[in-house]
Regions:
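Short S/T/G/P-rich N-terminal loop/turn motif that feeds into the first structured element of a domain
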Residues: 1-72, 83-107
Length: 107
């Protein structure tokens, strides 16, 4: 069964731009679709006060491989630079979970 991966980032200082997300997506080059990725979504949930990323993967191992091999090498230097800048709105997710899906459909 497919695996869901959810990340939620608290909206920082009222900033609802997608500058950080867009820069990371450009650097990761998602035109080269990661092996095992079935769907990727990202957007604001203003009621919850978060920017939410929701992915569905064939297996957790495929998702973790993408995160470790392609995503983290891009995020780690950005996070290190942001930690030195008190005005930065870059923050790690305040919620991050994996869970097995009972069912999924595409239309």
């Amino acid at each position: 069964m497919a695996i869901a991966y959810l990340q939620e980032f608290e909206i920082q200082n009222g900033d609802t731009s997608t500058t950080n997300y867009d820069a990371i997506v450009t650097a990761v080059n998602l035109e080269d679709v990661p092996d095992g990725l079935l769907i990727h979504t990202a957007g604001f949930d203003h009621d919850a006060g978060v920017f939410r990323i929701f992915d569905v993967w064939e297996t957790r191992e495929q998702g973790e491989k993408f995160i470790n091999d392609r995503l983290n090498p891009i995020i780690e230097p950005i996070a290190a630079a942001a930690a030195q800048n008190p005005d930065s709105n870059f923050a790690p997710p305040n919620r991050e979970i994996w869970y097995e899906l009972h069912d999924s459909m595409t239309g």
